[in-house]
């Protein structure tokens, strides 16, 4: 009897931590797989092209296979390049849960939650966000939208720019619906329009496409209103000319600046910490709000 109990305790102590990677893209993200292992998963099992219509059996497999006290060793990570599709899938996964039968789940499509949270948390550690005017340049992508929402939740007055006004308005509406925050939309199709968009801004974050320069040094370095800038682009040419990719809250022309790798170390540490948290119990639901809260503690 005692031997059986002891054997069961040993089995539980060495029970494998399984992370099921639910990706909306055809091929699950290699980046997310690597960080899943680095975050403490023993095995990462990726599934691609997932939708609310084809996940039922997969979710059932996670919630019905282990005893209640062992369910914490199974978790789900929702990813993919499409944030909107990821949000829908994330919510669909949870609809299959019921009392006693659930596992922890995290949403980080395109790295949007962890990247935005790390960026805004580093800005928050560098200065005051409440009451400041913030502009997210080319902010209609996953990272830009989430960063805008997080800044708004911190009390900043936020504007998202895009080459097309309708695209910026669409992003603002999505964030208002999801987070109940008000964000302004503004068209800014070229250097001059983007320089005009940040004229009165205190905070600027560039979240444009890889290798696209959004501002040149002369567009921001002499702007007396600007206090902090962050560039999420790590591939030359960088999003904001004059900011180094490795910059970590340094003073540049009287402004505090952060480069993509400068706050990227926090992004990776945060991502790993969230994965580890998934295996603490089976009831964690990690999305923008609690991921951002953790980022601020880690910053």
List PLM regions with ranges.
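Adenosine-phosphate binding glycine-rich loop
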Residues: 235-299
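Conserved active-site and cofactor/substrate-binding residues in soluble primary-metabolism enzymes
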Residues: 29, 49-53, 84-88, 114, ...
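Rossmann-like adenosine-cofactor binding region
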Residues: 183-257
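Alpha-helical transmembrane segments of multi-pass membrane proteins, especially transporters
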Residues: 109, 137-138, 223
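Glycine/charged-rich beta-loop-alpha catalytic/anionic-binding loops adjacent to active sites
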Residues: 98-106, 252-254
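A glycine-rich, Thr/Ser-enriched phosphate-binding loop motif common to dinucleotide/cofactor-binding enzymes
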Residues: 106-124
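Glycine-rich phosphate/diphosphate-binding loop of Rossmann-like nucleotide-binding domains
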Residues: 125-199, 203
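N-terminal ligand-binding/catalytic initiation module
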Residues: 2-100, 290-299
């Amino acid at each position: 009897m005692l031997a059986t109990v002891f054997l069961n305790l040993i089995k539980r102590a060495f029970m494998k931590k399984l992370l099921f990677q639910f990706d909306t893209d055809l091929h699950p993200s290699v980046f997310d797989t690597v960080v899943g292992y680095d975050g403490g998963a023993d095995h990462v099992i990726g599934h691609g092209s997932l939708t609310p219509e084809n996940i039922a059996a997969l979710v059932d497999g996670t919630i019905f296979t282990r005893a209640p006290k062992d369910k914490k060793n199974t978790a789900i990570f929702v990813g993919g390049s499409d944030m909107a599709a990821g949000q829908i899938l994330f919510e669909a996964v949870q609809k299959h849960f019921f009392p006693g039968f659930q596992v922890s789940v995290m949403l980080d499509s395109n790295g949007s939650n962890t990247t935005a949270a790390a960026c805004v948390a580093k800005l928050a550690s560098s200065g005051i966000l409440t009451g400041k005017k913030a502009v997210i340049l080319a902010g209609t992508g996953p990272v830009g939208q989430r960063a805008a929402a997080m800044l708004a939740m911190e009390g900043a007055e936020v504007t998202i720019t895009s080459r097309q006004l309708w695209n910026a308005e669409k992003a603002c509406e999505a964030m208002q619906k999801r987070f109940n925050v008000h964000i302004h939309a503004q068209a800014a199709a070229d250097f001059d329009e983007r320089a005009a968009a940040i004229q009165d801004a205190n905070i600027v974050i560039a979240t444009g496409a890889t290798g696209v320069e959004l501002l040149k040094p002369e567009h921001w370095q002499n702007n007396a209103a600007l206090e902090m800038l962050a560039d999420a682009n790590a591939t030359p040419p960088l999003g904001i000319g004059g900011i180094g990719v490795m910059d970590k809250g340094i003073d540049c022309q009287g402004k505090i600046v952060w480069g993509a790798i400068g706050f990227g170390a926090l992004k990776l540490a945060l991502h790993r910490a969230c994965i580890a948290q998934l295996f603490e119990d089976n009831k964690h639901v990690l999305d923008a709000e609690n991921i951002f809260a953790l980022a601020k503690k880690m910053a």
